[in-house]
Design a protein with these regions (language model features):
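Helicase P-loop NTPase motor core of nucleic-acid translocases
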Residues: 1-222
Length: 222
């Protein structure tokens, strides 16, 4: 059916840059929608040739649920029974289920998933417990202890650690930057003198609230 069009396709293929051709070959390993393919053909800055899990990270960021870390697994792990002679090779291929590129993709997916519950911050312990459960139940592997901290330099490309020193939680970059901006604005406003004081005695008003408990230290601080 397509024989008459093959010369046109061949000329089009040969006219592409080597980078675009390599990207197309890489993307053909996965079951992807056309809009995802088009994005990664155009986005030459995204190094999917070395890290195919950037595809699932981007899809999580854009709430494209049809493409997950598991989708990328199918094309990144060598499987001659499916891929024949075209098995993936390093640096593209996933070396193990504990491949840090794969783990980072799982973390990013989880961070976007919990947004529906109103959570923008997840403790490092909670996230490692989540990964540990996945490894144990689905992949039969043992997650190295403190992996989010020991591999921080690689992971923080995609999300931030909070606080920066001695972190206890992780957060998507866009939400971390948003909160940093708001903190900066509020700090600057707090430094300014009030032009028109209201004259209200806020302490007395707070203490008159029915929920105020003078015997409770936390209530006093609030």
């Amino acid at each position: 059916v397509y024989n008459s069009s093959l010369p046109t396709y061949r000329i089009s293929w040969e006219g592409q840059t080597s980078n675009v051709r390599e990207r197309l070959i890489t993307l053909s390993r996965f079951e992807l929608e056309s809009d995802v393919i088009e994005h990664f053909i155009d986005d030459v800055e995204s190094d999917i040739l070395s890290n195919p899990y950037l595809i699932s990270e981007w899809c999580a960021r854009n709430f494209i649920e049809k493409v997950s870390t598991r989708t990328i697994d199918l094309g990144a792990f060598p499987d001659p029974t499916i891929q024949g002679d075209n098995v993936p090779v390093p640096p593209f291929a996933a070396e193990s289920i504990l491949d840090t590129r794969r783990l980072r993709s799982l973390v990013v997916e989880r961070l976007y998933s919990v947004l529906t519950d109103g959570d923008t911050l997840v403790s490092i312990k909670e996230m490692e417990d989540y990964l540990r459960d996945i490894m144990t139940e689905e992949d039969k592997a043992r997650l190295p202890k403190n992996i989010l901290l020991t591999h921080r330099q690689f992971f923080e490309v995609s999300f931030d650690y909070v606080p920066d020193e001695n972190p206890t939680a992780i957060q998507l970059k866009e939400y971390y930057q948003m909160e940093e901006f708001l903190r900066k604005v509020l700090r600057e406003r707090a430094k300014r003198d009030v032009k028109k004081p209201t004259g209200e005695d806020w302490l007395s008003l707070a203490m008159s609230d029915k929920n105020y408990d003078p015997t409770n230290e936390r209530s006093q601080q609030a």
